[in-house]
């Protein structure tokens, strides 16, 4: 049976991981957090002193994910999307969170001031939405609000319905 590949993207703190794990649990699709994949496989290309974090080796991440993506049925969670091959995804969801809520979430994570401000600016200027629109066909890119717990359930239901329809349409 053919299964779709889904990308969940958005600024850190918008709820990609929470949504992705719950969606995978309910749908039976496989969940992949690119940050965890990189950490476990040491898929890095240096260290960013300014932000205090490793630099992702995008080519190695793509090589690592390629077999799973070809097979299908994968939910990918990452805050960037411009290095993934366009052919991988059947739909892309960009999660969006109001700035005040996002600020509190990132502050709770212990983000230092520059990292906090840069991520809030990223959300204000819709950087990741624009990146998704530039990287994929417009008709497969969708924005979802991610401010309150009720919206999480709404998003899961909406994506689950999309998955069901996709499976029906692609498995005669």
Swiss-Prot record:
Gene Ontology BP terms: ribosomal small subunit biogenesis; rRNA processing
Cellular localisation: Cytoplasm; Nucleus, Nucleoplasm; Nucleus, Cajal body
Enzyme class: transferase
Subunit structure: Monomer and homodimer. Interacts with small ribosomal subunit protein uS11. Not a structural component of 43S pre-ribosomes, but transiently interacts with them by binding to uS11. Interacts with COIL (via C-terminus).
Family affiliation: Belongs to the adenylate kinase family. AK6 subfamily.
Matching HAMAP family: Adenylate_kinase_AK6
Name the record gives this protein: Adenylate kinase isoenzyme 6
Organism field: Rattus norvegicus (Rat)
The gene coding this protein: Ak6
